[in-house]
Amino acid sequence: MAKRRISEADGQAALTAALAGDTSRTVLATAVRYLLEELAELAPGNSVEVRVPPFGATQCVAGPKHTRGTPPNVIETDPETWLALATGRIDWQTAVEEARIVASGSRADLHGLLPIMRRPL
């Protein structure tokens, strides 16, 4: 498992600010990275790569490990959608139907792992 880089206090503060409407780059970046770290801790592994450009990416979910090139299971979304998914403000299926997620590969589905954290709307 990768070493955490964002403290719980800093991550929670950024997440709270982002959910309250703070769209500054620093706040969004910290909130996104914090939630990616939470996902990697919740579902350790290397079979799925989750990308949230331009702020971060993580590998998660146990299973076959790739070592070279593009991983076979990739999920990509924007920062706002990632925050919404990770906090239960939108569900996986809705985000897929609205084309807010690009997912490829047989394991590229996080519906059973989300939301990571529940926040009041």
Regions found by a protein language model. Give the residues of each.
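Feature captures hydrophobic
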Residues: 1-121
